[in-house]
Amino acid sequence: MDFQLQAVDDNARAGVLNLAHSQVETPVFMPVGTQGCIKSLDAMDAQEILGAKLILANTYHMYLRPGEKVVEQLGGLHRFAQFQGSFLTDSGGFQAFSLSDNVKLQEDGIVFKSHIDGSKHLFTPIKVLDIQYSLNSDIMMVLDDLVGLPAPLKRLEESIKRSAKWANMSLEYHKENNRPNNNLFAIIQGGTHLKMRSLSVGLTHEGFDGYAIGGLAVGESVDEMLETIAHTAPLLPKDKPRYLMGVGTPENILDAISLGVDMFDCVMPTRNARNATLFTHSGKISIKNAPYKLDDTPIEENCACYACKRYSKAYLHHLFRAKELTYARLASLHNLHFYLELVKNARNAILEKRFLSFKKEFLEKYHSCSH
């Protein structure tokens, strides 16, 4: 993997990630395709309509169903899903903790029960890499010990030491395997405790292809999250991409870009879409509300998304009320277009050295009204 930093505006960064299956401009928002597809969308929607170059899939889910060996036998995740861009896969540790009963944390990994059939499994740092090799992920995440917040200092210290140990084991194993098309990212932990974040960075070896700031958006306040990002991002190598995992709102993303973050993922645009909340530059609207029953205008005037070019709010309102599956597709296409355009416009502003004014103007309009 090659990462080229093209411009810096204050702390905001614009760059290019050259991966085996695509060239990705940063800042980048990655739509979440947990099971190998974005919910309600297929690969053509992702690449042809949205223009997405990099999407996220989930190691835990692909391992349990259909199984990584099935995916490998069918040509890897790209061929299986017919997606011509790149895949980032997370390690599955978060899902093992959050979806399983009776999770047991061990020094060598995580023991968990499948949420599908109750079968028992062990994820180790090596095993999750082998799974991701079978999937042929462009970017692989190391297994980490994620802590919900608030958490005692002792638990945070255990987490960062274990996460760093697992990350460094993963790096050594990855070097032995000599797979240049499968890039490995480390994950920095430490909750909102700034000294713990510094310690996590110090314990994690150099030599990873990128670095993620993990363990946020798990119960802390927005101010605590931003303070943690502001402290952690400058500690990471300047010549490597920085990934903020699982965050978040349009405001969160712009704030994190201003603090030097390059990569984002979140289920918010698609989950909100399915639950009737649509993003516009003037704030969010709830398409299920009665005023939209006779509204013949698009979700947002001047929006170039597939849904806005073809359909009215009244039609979307009807589809949602009728529980039609087509609603989820159209609403998800709109919300993802909004997110992808947001980071694209942020990137252009960084290249033109006007990011702070762009951010200010966007937020002023975005907070002007919601319906």
UniProtKB/Swiss-Prot annotation:
Substrates-to-products reaction catalysed: 7-aminomethyl-7-carbaguanine + guanosine(34) in tRNA = 7-aminomethyl-7-carbaguanosine(34) in tRNA + guanine
Quaternary state and interactors: Homodimer. Within each dimer, one monomer is responsible for RNA recognition and catalysis, while the other monomer binds to the replacement base PreQ1.
Residue ranges, annotated region (RNA binding): 246-252, 270-274
Species: Helicobacter pylori (strain J99 / ATCC 700824) (Campylobacter pylori J99)
Protein family (similarity comment): Belongs to the queuine tRNA-ribosyltransferase family.
Native organism taxonomy: Bacteria, Pseudomonadati, Campylobacterota, Epsilonproteobacteria, Campylobacterales
Enzyme class, spelled out: transferase
Active-site residues annotated for this sequence: D90 (proton acceptor), D265 (nucleophile)
Name the record gives this protein: Queuine tRNA-ribosyltransferase
EC number from the UniProt entry: 2.4.2.29
Binding residues annotated for Zn(2+), in chain numbering: C303, C305, C308, H334
